[in-house]
């Protein structure tokens, strides 16, 4: 095994100095070098957006492997399965490259072993690791290794409901039945079901599962806030805070006003009350003459009605404005006083009921503990578990079995975790148990922590950050702030926004120079004024937006969509490709509206992992309504849908003329009356409509007759062919996807009937049941256009980068500010536990004849939890905006909607510590309001973005524009568009042209980059043919395949082993083979075992021939010069096309060559079948010449010996070319 010492701090500093002095275009930053080579302690890398954290992780892993640490000695936790796969792929590529450059047999053997172990190394998600651990050691807890993960939500819900129902009945009939009924009623109110209580139990259970020890949390933390709540103490603290806070400010305000008002409004009656209020406040605050509670009530009495309101009518505009400003501020003070008075009343009532609340919640605690235990027992009985169960089993195994924990700690040289800011407490506990206390490497960025809904806790990262910052002995803190992604315009705008918004109060981190993004290269710093960040706001009257449309799930407005489309079309006209543009949405609710609008304007749009509803796609809905109408023409909805469809094109006017044929009855009866001119108004049935009716009634009758004696599959294809509907959708945008949907409908109908169910009626019934249940048929794989605008959520975009980014719905309200946010009957907090709204009966405290007087009271814990949850929610929204803004490489657009008048006037210029005041940031409800508040408070030069309001008049169809798309085809014209005699004659003429196109393909269809194999294929016809007499030859012309094909899976068929697969396996074997003085069959077998191919393919690799190769002169030469051997070497060179004289790049991979002092020996393995070596020598002569030319130019060496190693014949042949 290799052993190489790790760098000391002095050696790391030396490495930093060497890097700074180098002439590299892109140098490693000092912080990157520290992150790669530091060792011997826990390390936290705070990596800002685009700072190359993945690069750092890969380089650190490679450095450790280079020093003799095996890949199986590292624990590497990634956030997603995809990230783990990408990391493994990167490591394998880099290790393979290092293998080719290895100088000793020991090094080659070690690296080869590491490559082989990557697949089984502990690189993956924490869920994957805990499953592996429980598989191996679950027996210690009595868990069978054959357990199954319960991923189906329906299965989980069914099992939970069964356990809950049994337990609920037990409690309803138990010794505490009366108290339990009160508990349930507290959350269900007058509802006839206990669903609200069940939801509470499930939410507490789910929350507990995200902790390291659910049972411990339920016992110690669930009721912690309620146990510690002291309403009387809270009341006294609130009264004490009034003296130096609200009341002192109110006194100062009234004093200032009185000084001016006695001069300007001397005779106003309200001034007496103002003077009395000042006397009261001075007596209490200065002389302690009045009890605070009494003072509050007296002030509210004085301010009642218009007591403190200036009712004068000054003519002077300045005085009028002053009066209005006074009244507005006074009203705000009075509202705060009333709020305090209400809080004091609530605290008094809570103090009286506090002894009633705790026993009720203790019963809830017992219920949840019993539910958790019984639910787990039910899962154990079925040997099926949730991911959280497996994680807790793993923690228990390590905590309760020290010998197991020690074996893991001894195994891992380092415990690494990516995206550390999104760790949960369960994951953190696992990492603590796997680490030896000083070998953790954590990479993340708290500014990008956006997964609280998955129980991630950014405070875990923040605690480590503060600890390492204040106490370097506890661990090393490394900050990566250089951004290698974005241009300076994007970086400046991001810094401008967050340096004035984000701090530890809101955002959980102080965004100062330590965290500001810095351009990592000179190219990023080059100014591009046209790419300055733009805030685009669709100017709309806010009064037109109802409360129902506001909230975190509000829909995007048509104005915003039009605004975005206009900008995209403008970019497109400037030469920007659609694929360089990305839309970031807060959620997927906007997807459908965006897709419809973009399609109307001819802009291709691809949503990321959008679960499009197959049964709700327009073409499928039309076909389903067609089948419904055939099955039952009296179905008015289906019939009208079919009439309006492109197959028959009835418009609103046509339908109206049909509808007036009878006062009542089914629409089909009215249609027949219109057709036979026997209705109430036959005179309105004009000739054109009559022709449509004739076509429709005859076609429908034909389809109905056909359906009686043919399969649904045949009926569907008859509909497609009779009305050319399949061809019609082929002329629409996203044509391939639409045709795939229609094709799949026919296949699914066929599959349905093969199950034994027959008949159109039953098929429609099955589809309708699926729709009614809210489910869908499996969607057809989207045929995604390559050059298309991408659409994804901000969460999905994390870790990605795009040239042009539009952040949508900047005006969306945050959850904490929305009508439904934090307004439920309970809020759960990790530290304080459960806070509830208590249903109190105040009958005994208020004189009333009512049997009960129930009032909902917010407990102290509920109020505290709401404050914390609201602040945490706003902080995460701020981090989400940071993630969105840092995705852009070139230009960033922030798009919203609102009233220009309101947005430009509602914020002041108050600033605290160069930031918006906390109170303002805390109250702001949208990203857009943050931006506009910044725009008002700070200079534009500090913010680096521009704000532009767009009027509706600027978004007319003419102003927006249109992207040219292929016009849709009229179904009625398709019958004349078939292959007529003229087309046949034209095709005959074109055949000769096609032959010339094939002959001179290199000159006609020349790309900028080619591989040697492609060049061989392209130039073979030219090499083999002289002149143009090929025009007279009929053979050899291959028709172009343009139609989409749909292949069904062939289950059970054996994989066909192709020659190409065997060839690839052979090449990989020779690449992986560790060479020594004497190659043996065992060496070849070992190398073959590491080849990534099917066993059937490996069986076809002829090891005896390969072994014989090393007995040839060339084989011996290679073994004698192993240190000068290069294998799988990439190359690139410039070449000229002989037909067009155009330059192009040739790129490829050379199987191997020896770099000797006097010459280069080039060789290439070929597994093609041959009867005589000269065949392959001629075939590959051009390719080998290209290889030789590339090597000769690269090494400035004229002599290149070229050999083909032929493995496809009866015997192995080595042929010099």
Swiss-Prot record:
Superkingdom field: Bacteria
Family: Belongs to the helicase family. AddA subfamily.
Domain UvrD-like helicase ATP-binding stretches: 26-487
Keyword annotations: ATP-binding, DNA damage, DNA repair, DNA-binding, Exonuclease, Helicase, Hydrolase, Isomerase, Nuclease, Nucleotide-binding
Biological role stated in the UniProt entry: The heterodimer acts as both an ATP-dependent DNA helicase and an ATP-dependent, dual-direction single-stranded exonuclease. Recognizes the chi site generating a DNA molecule suitable for the initiation of homologous recombination. The AddA nuclease domain is required for chi fragment generation; this subunit has the helicase and 3' -> 5' nuclease activities.
Family annotation (HAMAP family): AddA (MF_01451)
GO cellular component terms, semicolon-separated: cytosol; DNA helicase complex
Binding site for ATP: 47-54
MF terms (GO), sorted A to Z: 3'-5' DNA helicase activity; 3'-5' exonuclease activity; ATP binding; ATP hydrolysis activity; double-stranded DNA binding
Domain spans labelled UvrD-like helicase C-terminal: 515-799
SUBUNIT field: Heterodimer of AddA and AddB/RexB.
Required co-factors: Mg(2+)
Enzyme Commission (EC) number: 3.1.-.-, 5.6.2.4
Name this protein carries in UniProt: ATP-dependent helicase/nuclease subunit A
Reaction(s) catalysed (UniProt annotation): Couples ATP hydrolysis with the unwinding of duplex DNA by translocating in the 3'-5' direction; ATP + H2O = ADP + phosphate + H(+)
UniProt cross-references to CDD domains, sorted A to Z: DEXQc_UvrD
SUPFAM superfamilies (UniProt xref): P-loop containing nucleoside triphosphate hydrolases, Restriction endonuclease-like
GO terms classed as biological process: double-strand break repair via homologous recombination
InterPro entries reported in the protein's UniProt record: AddA, DNA_helicase_UvrD-like_C, DNA_helicase_UvrD/REP, P-loop_NTPase, PDDEXK-like_dom_sf, PDDEXK_AddAB-type, Restrct_endonuc-II-like, UvrD-like_ATP-bd
Gene3D superfamilies xref list: 3.90.320.10, P-loop containing nucleotide triphosphate hydrolases, PCRA, domain 4
């Amino acid at each position: 095994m290799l052993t190489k010492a790790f760098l000391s701090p002095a050696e790391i500093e030396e490495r930093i100095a060497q890097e700074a002095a180098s002439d590299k275009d892109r140098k490693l930053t000092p912080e990157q070098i520290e992150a790669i080579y530091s060792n011997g302690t826990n390390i936290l890398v705070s990596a800002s957006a685009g700072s190359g954290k993945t690069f750092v992780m890969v380089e650190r892993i490679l450095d450790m492997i280079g020093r003799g640490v095996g890949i199986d000695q590292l624990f590497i936790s990634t956030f997603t399965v995809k990230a783990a796969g990408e990391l493994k792929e990167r490591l394998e590529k880099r290790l393979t490259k290092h293998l080719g450059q290895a100088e000793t047999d020991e090094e080659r053997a070690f690296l080869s072993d590491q490559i082989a172990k990557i697949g089984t190394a502990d690189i993956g998600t924490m869920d994957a690791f805990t499953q592996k651990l429980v598989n191996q050691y679950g027996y210690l807890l009595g868990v069978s290794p054959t357990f199954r993960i319960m991923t189906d939500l329906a299965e989980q819900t069914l099992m939970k409901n069964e356990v809950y129902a049994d337990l609920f009945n037990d409690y309803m009939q138990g010794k505490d039945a009366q108290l339990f009924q009160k508990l349930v009623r507290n959350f269900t109110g007058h509802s006839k079901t206990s669903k609200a209580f069940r939801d509470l139990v499930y939410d507490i259970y789910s929350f507990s599962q995200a902790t390291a020890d659910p049972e411990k949390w339920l016992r110690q933390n669930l009721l912690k806030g309620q146990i510690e709540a002291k309403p009387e103490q809270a009341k006294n603290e609130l009264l004490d805070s009034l003296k130096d806070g609200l009341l002192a400010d109110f006194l100062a305000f009234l004093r200032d006003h009185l000084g001016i008002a006695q001069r300007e409004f001397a005779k106003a009656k309200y001034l007496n009350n103002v003077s009395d209020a000042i006397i009261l406040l001075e007596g209490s605050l200065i002389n302690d003459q009045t009890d605070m509670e009494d003072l509050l009530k007296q002030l509210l009495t004085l301010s009642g009605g218009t007591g403190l309101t200036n009712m004068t009518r000054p003519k002077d505009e300045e005085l009028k404005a002053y009066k209005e400003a006074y009244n507005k501020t006074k009203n705000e003070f009075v509202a705060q006083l009333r709020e305090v008075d209400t809080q004091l009343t609530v605290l008094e009532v809570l103090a009286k009921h506090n002894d009633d609340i705790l026993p009720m919640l203790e019963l809830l605690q017992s219920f949840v503990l019993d539910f958790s235990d019984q639910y787990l027992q039910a899962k154990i009985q079925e040997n099926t578990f949730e991911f959280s169960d497996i994680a807790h089993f793993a923690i228990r195994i390590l905590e309760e079995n020290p010998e197991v924990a020690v074996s893991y700690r001894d195994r891992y040289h380092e415990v690494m975790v990516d995206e550390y800011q999104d760790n949960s407490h369960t994951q953190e506990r696992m990492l603590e148990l796997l680490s030896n206390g000083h070998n953790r490497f954590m990479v993340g960025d708290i500014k990008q922590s956006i997964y609280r809904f998955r129980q991630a806790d950014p405070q875990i990262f923040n605690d480590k950050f503060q600890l390492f910052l204040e106490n370097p002995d506890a661990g090393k803190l490394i900050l990566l702030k250089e951004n290698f992604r974005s241009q300076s315009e994007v970086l400046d705008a991001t810094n401008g926004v967050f340096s004035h918004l984000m701090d530890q109060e809101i955002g959980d981190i102080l965004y100062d120079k330590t965290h500001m993004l810095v351009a990592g290269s000179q190219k990023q710093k080059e100014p591009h004024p046209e790419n300055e960040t733009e805030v685009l706001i669709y100017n709309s009257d806010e009064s037109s937006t109802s409360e129902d449309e506001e909230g975190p799930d509000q829909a995007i407005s048509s104005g915003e969509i039009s605004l975005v489309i206009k900008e995209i079309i403008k970019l497109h006209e400037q030469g920007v490709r659609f694929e360089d543009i990305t839309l970031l949405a807060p959620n997927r609710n906007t997807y459908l509206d965006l897709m419809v609008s973009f399609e109307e304007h001819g802009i291709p749009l691809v949503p990321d992992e959008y679960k499009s509803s197959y049964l709700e796609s327009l073409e499928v809905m039309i076909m389903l309504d067609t089948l419904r109408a055939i099955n039952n023409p009296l179905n008015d909805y289906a019939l009208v849908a079919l009439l309006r469809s492109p197959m028959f094109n009835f418009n609103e006017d046509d339908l109206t003329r049909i509808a007036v044929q009878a006062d009542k009855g089914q629409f089909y009866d009215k249609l027949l009356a219109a057709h036979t001119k026997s209705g109430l108004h036959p005179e309105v049935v004009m000739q054109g409509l009559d022709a449509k009716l004739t076509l429709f009634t005859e076609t429908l009758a034909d389809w109905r007759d056909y359906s009686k004696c043919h399969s649904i599959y045949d009926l569907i294809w008859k509909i497609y062919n009779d009305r050319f509907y399949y061809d019609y959708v082929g002329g629409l945008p996203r044509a391939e996807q639409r045709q795939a949907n229609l094709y799949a409908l026919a296949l699914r109908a066929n599959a349905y009937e093969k199950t034994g169910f027959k008949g159109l009626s039953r098929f429609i019934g099955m589809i309708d049941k699926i729709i009614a249940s809210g489910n869908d048929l499996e969607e057809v794989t989207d045929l995604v256009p390559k050059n298309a605008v991408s659409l994804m959520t901000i969460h999905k975009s994390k870790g990605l980068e795009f040239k042009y980014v539009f952040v949508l719905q900047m005006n969306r309200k945050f959850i904490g500010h929305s009508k439904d946010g934090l307004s439920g009957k309970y809020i759960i907090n990790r530290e304080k536990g459960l806070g509830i709204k208590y249903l109190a009966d105040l009958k005994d405290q208020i004189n009333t004849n009512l049997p009960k007087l129930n009032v909902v009271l917010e407990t102290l814990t509920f109020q505290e939890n709401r404050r914390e949850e609201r602040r945490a929610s706003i902080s995460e929204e701020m981090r989400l905006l940071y993630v969105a803004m840092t995705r852009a490489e070139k230009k960033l657009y922030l798009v919203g909607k609102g009233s220009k008048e309101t947005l430009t006037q509602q914020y002041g210029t108050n600033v605290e510590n160069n930031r918006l005041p906390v109170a303002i940031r805390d109250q702001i409800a949208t990203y857009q309001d943050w931006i506009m508040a910044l725009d008002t408070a700070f200079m534009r030069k500090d913010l680096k973005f521009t704000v532009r309001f767009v009027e509706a008049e600027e978004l007319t169809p003419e102003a927006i524009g249109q992207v040219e798309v292929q016009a849709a085809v009229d179904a009625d014209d398709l019958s004349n568009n078939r292959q007529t005699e003229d087309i046949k004659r034209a095709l005959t003429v074109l055949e000769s042209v096609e032959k010339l196109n094939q002959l001179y393909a290199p000159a006609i269809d020349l790309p900028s980059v080619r591989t040697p194999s492609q060049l061989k294929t392209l130039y073979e016809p030219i090499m083999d043919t002289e002149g143009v007499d090929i025009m007279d030859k009929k053979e050899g012309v291959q028709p172009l395949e343009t139609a989409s094909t749909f292949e069904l899976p062939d289950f059970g068929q054996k994989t066909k082993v192709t020659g190409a697969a065997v060839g690839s396996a052979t090449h990989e074997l020779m690449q992986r083979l560790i060479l020594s003085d004497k190659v043996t069959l065992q060496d070849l077998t070992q190398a073959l075992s590491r080849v990534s191919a099917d066993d059937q393919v490996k069986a076809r690799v002829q090891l005896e021939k390969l072994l014989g190769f090393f007995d040839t002169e060339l084989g011996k030469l290679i073994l004698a010069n192993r240190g000068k051997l290069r294998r799988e070497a990439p190359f690139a060179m410039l070449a000229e096309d002989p037909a067009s004289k155009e330059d192009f790049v040739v790129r490829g991979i050379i199987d191997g060559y020896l770099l000797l002092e006097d010459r280069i020996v080039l060789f290439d393995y070929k597994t093609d079948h041959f009867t005589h070596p000269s065949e392959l020598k001629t075939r590959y002569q051009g390719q080998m010449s290209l290889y030789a030319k590339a090597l000769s130019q690269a090494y400035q060496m004229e002599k290149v010996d070229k050999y083909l190693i032929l493995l496809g014949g009866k015997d192995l042949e080595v042929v010099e070319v």
